[in-house]
């Protein structure tokens, strides 16, 4: 089970030293489960509710508690990927999780960045810009 959702007095009563890493998940088993539908990998980011996270449902049936991530963050979460904090239910952008994942990028490293080159990358960049942009003001009548 995931440490955050284990029953009190049962698995959750065990000390932190008895926690194991949650199941591996994602492409090539590079990630770790953070919740029943959340799989995060340092170099790939987090997959929420996707096929990459399906294996994470198995964790609910395992008898011993697990915990992924190193540094605590947010509301009962742990740093899961560069700038991302996850608990067993959701993930949020968390600046304090950025420093933990700084590593040099090598030419042979595979990451989502290379998969988003071209039109897909341009679309994602535009969506991110729109999400961070202030609400547009209505145009004045007749003034274009």
UniProtKB/Swiss-Prot annotation:
InterPro entries per the UniProt record, alphabetical: Neurhyp_horm (IPR000981), Neurhyp_horm_dom_sf (IPR036387), Neurohypophysial_hormone_CS (IPR022423)
Gene3D superfamilies recorded: Neurohypophysial hormone domain
GO molecular function, a single term: V1A vasopressin receptor binding
Known partners and oligomeric status: Interacts with vasopressin receptors V1bR/AVPR1B (Ki=85 pM), V1aR/AVPR1A (Ki=0.6 nM) and V2R/AVPR2 (Ki=4.9 nM). Interacts with oxytocin receptor (OXTR) (Ki=110 nM).
Family: Belongs to the vasopressin/oxytocin family.
Role played: Neurophysin 2 specifically binds vasopressin. Vasopressin has a direct antidiuretic action on the kidney, it also causes vasoconstriction of the peripheral vessels. Acts by binding to vasopressin receptors (V1bR/AVPR1B, V1aR/AVPR1A, and V2R/AVPR2).
Protein name as it appears in the record: Vasopressin-neurophysin 2-copeptin
Organism of derivation: Cavia porcellus
Organism placement in taxonomy: Eukaryota, Metazoa, Chordata, Craniata, Vertebrata
